[in-house]
Design a protein with these regions (language model features):
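Charge-dense, helix-prone N-terminal extensions
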Residues: 1-123
Length: 123
């Protein structure tokens, strides 16, 4: 897979106030995972989504939102946990997939920002 779509998503998401990343080199199945969180990098914060190195992105949403995203074709059930009530997934294979992934990240970002309040940009 071309890494540019993942880099493009990272540049955009890290440009949002209060978003930082946390890298896990030994994610599920031995695949590296980059999680994007909202809050303070020192104390942590809720994840707005994560991307596996193979381009598989996962997001947790309220059940109603997750179900609507899947019904509308904007997301798919999680491949390993298809019966999860809150986890939606999205495949990033090319630059054409970037807008859809950013939409899901932005939805969770806005939800977290509303719930947790504004935060200063973390460097």
């Amino acid at each position: 897979m071309n890494d540019e779509p993942l880099a493009q998503i990272e540049r955009e998401v890290l440009g949002w106030d209060g978003v930082f990343k946390k890298r896990d080199e030994d994610g599920p199945g031995g695949i590296g995972v980059t999680g994007y969180r909202y809050g303070d990098a020192e104390t942590g914060g809720p994840q707005i989504g994560h991307i596996h190195d193979d381009g598989h992105a996962d997001f947790r949403f309220p059940r109603e939102v997750r179900d609507e995203l899947i019904r509308s074709g904007r997301a798919i059930p999680h491949p390993a946990f298809p019966n999860s009530r809150t986890t939606a997934s999205y495949r990033i294979r090319s630059a054409d997939d970037v807008p859809g992934a950013l939409e899901l990240f932005r939805m969770n970002y806005e939800r977290r920002k509303e719930r947790n309040g504004p935060t200063a940009k973390v460097g």
